[in-house]
Amino acid sequence: MNILAFDTCFDACSAALLLGSTARIVSCFEPMATGHAERLVPMIGEVVLQSGLNFKDVDRIAVTFGPRTFTGKSIGVAAARALALALDKPLVAATSLSVMAEQMADEIEVSRDPAARHILIATDARREEVYCQLFRGRDALSAPAVLQPRA
């Protein structure tokens, strides 16, 4: 299965295409605080071109939908929805926090330490706030939350 995925929820813009037949990943990542709307579509085009596939070869579209600023997540979700409709492909979405927890869960499984299975993902929400969510492995134990750290 060939999966086209992208993220616009943080201070970077990224797109990747997983080529299911070879498990190869073609990706593009650019740090940026703003400008996601201008870079996302060209970035998606770049990864598809570099992969040697055509858009019709994509089997699924994946996108993150926050938490983050309204504009950041709206850009990614709108692009994902447009591509999914235009290509008649299924669309899957995940929170950025759950994607990060998934990556950590893979590392924890290697360690096999039961105490290490609880994962707290915390990211800068700006304005002196933090987005956070608690997981046990890949399972969410809480909803995403916005917290104000105390001094």
Residue ranges and their predicted role:
Residues 23, 35, 90-151:
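Surface "functional belts" at beta-alpha junctions
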Residues 44, 79-83, 100-104:
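Buried hydrophobic packing segments
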Residues 12, 69, 127-129:
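Glycine-rich nucleotide phosphate-binding loop and flanking beta-alpha elements
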Residues 47-51, 86, 104:
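Stable alpha-helical structural segments in soluble proteins, enriched in small hydrophobic residues
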Residues 53, 85, 111-112:
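Short, charge-rich binding segments
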Residues 1-65:
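N-terminal beta-alpha supersecondary unit
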Residues 62-96:
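DPxDG-like acidic metal-binding loop motif
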